[in-house]
């Protein structure tokens, strides 16, 4: 299955093209994807900037879909606020962004993934206002797509960036994704687009032969 948008793959591909000299160090790279043309460009500090379409959640909270909070192990009094994330042209419905009252609550969530896979919609993004150097924190679950919890999710940050930039009144933020592996993504809101900035390291090289 080819996914419409994959931040990991785009970042890694750009990194390899720069590292091997197949793309000029100071030039932009264009990728043709199911989400249209996406660009990547290396910044002065070595981080790679991805230019992706924004997927903003609806600003007003909605009633959670049946079974969502129970599958996440969240009681009604936990203070969760659910926002629908429209996904144009998607056949499996919207995603859900669930804002939680604290990073501690976010870390403690232990989903029932089989139950979560039965909830209407594509995927679930959990988020809370960040601590320390991080403006916001998140986790991402997509058991219907075979990904119980993703390590770091570019597509989720296409929704998190406009959500938190609007909430905090700033155009550039730093987010931490609190999966077991964890990761840091810098984001910039640019109208209908989002800039995602990350780092990449080559850990394995191979050779394909016919």
Predicted segments with their positions:
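Active-site proximal loop and beta-alpha junction motif in alpha/beta enzyme cores
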Residues: 1-210
